[in-house]
């Protein structure tokens, strides 16, 4: 995996928090950029997992392998809004492809539909989202608060989201690989 130059920031890129962001929801976060334009940016944090039970009446997930469904904190904005990231191309007419084989959106009813669904489909239910005003993310890059990395279905739906931050930095190599070993609590160093 190679680091993407800042100029390549676009839908489908990963924002990887610099160790300089310490504390708060963005500390050691990996954000999937879902939209980026001069007017602003919108993304979903992928590695802040929420341990909650899903009420069957709200989330009809009976046709999904439970190990393939995760709940996460998508960001600090509108935490009562749920964003759906998934790998089901069958719902592509009501979804937007963010990167190859990863879709955003769709009606929750598609999750309960058995037809066309495979038990290999993966889903992230993200509570809230992350947003930046026009120029804000660019300013944060200049302050070296974020690194840019390419995304893939494998990274987004990893079986080890708690290691996503260090794994992505490790794959970027070079100085990024050494940053991946910095302990969360520097007093433990």
UniProtKB/Swiss-Prot annotation:
Protein name according to UniProt: UPF0301 protein CT_211
HAMAP family to which the protein is assigned, alphabetical: UPF0301
Cystine crosslinks: none
CC per GO annotation: cytosol
Family from the record: Belongs to the UPF0301 (AlgH) family.
Domain of life of the source: Bacteria
One Pfam family matching this protein: DUF179
Organism: Chlamydia trachomatis serovar D (strain ATCC VR-885 / DSM 19411 / UW-3/Cx)
């Amino acid at each position: 995996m190679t680091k993407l130059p800042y100029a390549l920031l676009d839908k489908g890129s990963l924002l990887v928090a610099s160790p300089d962001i310490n504390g708060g929801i963005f500390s050691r976060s990996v954000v999937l950029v879902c939209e980026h334009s001069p007017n602003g940016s919108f993304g979903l944090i992928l590695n802040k997992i929420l341990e909650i039970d899903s009420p069957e009446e709200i989330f009809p997930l009976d046709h999904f392998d439970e190990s393939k469904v995760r709940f996460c904190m998508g960001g600090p904005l509108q935490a009562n809004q749920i964003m759906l990231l998934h790998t089901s191309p069958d719902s592509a007419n009501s979804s937007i492809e963010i990167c190859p084989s990863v879709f955003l959106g769709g009606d929750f009813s598609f999750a309960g539909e058995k037809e066309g669904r495979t038990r290999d489909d993966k889903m992230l239910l993200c509570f809230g989202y992350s947003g930046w005003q026009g120029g804000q993310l660019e300013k944060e890059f200049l302050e070296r608060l974020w690194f840019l990395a390419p995304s893939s279905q494998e990274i987004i739906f990893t079986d080890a989201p708690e290691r996503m931050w260090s794994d992505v930095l490790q794959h970027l190599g070079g100085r990024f690989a050494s940053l991946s070993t910095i302990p969360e609590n520097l007093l433990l160093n």
